[in-house]
């Protein structure tokens, strides 16, 4: 692995919001996982805060409507997961594009789960404009909640297996 990618986070209509580099640590037909550093200062996301220097292990699935970022402090302590409900990503050469649908899920190692930005999701009016995308987003939210509740990858560290190995490696189906 070790390939550098540029990640392009786009809004729900495909317009780029931000971009940054990451290093691929796993890649197969199901998706890819990359490592990136948070460089945007402190940001309170609900159940935890993102801090300058935090490491993200970002898992993107090519056929799922969500992605998951395992967030660790600069010292390696697991803060939790930030999950984006999003259209499946597009890999174009060394560029990864994903369209954020605003709805997010925050999960902490103790198992607490918080849905955030549901007001922004409703404001997109996907239920009226794109009923299929709306249904996929709600299904993705339920899928992530079930995976977290079952301590299944990429949330296996909820079982207390904090050995430092990447939870997103071995993407599976």
Where are the language model's segments positioned?
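Charge-rich, low-complexity N-terminal segments
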Residues: 1-55
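Short acidic-glycine loop/turn motifs at beta-strand connectors
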Residues: 27-30, 74-76, 108-112
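A hydrophobic, small-residue-rich beta->alpha segment in the mid-to-C-terminal subdomain
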Residues: 101-145
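Cysteine/selenocysteine-centered motifs that mediate thiol-based redox chemistry or coordinate metal-sulfur cofactors
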Residues: 142-173
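A short, polar/proline- and glycine-enriched secondary-structure boundary/capping micro-motif
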Residues: 43-49, 93-94, 124-128
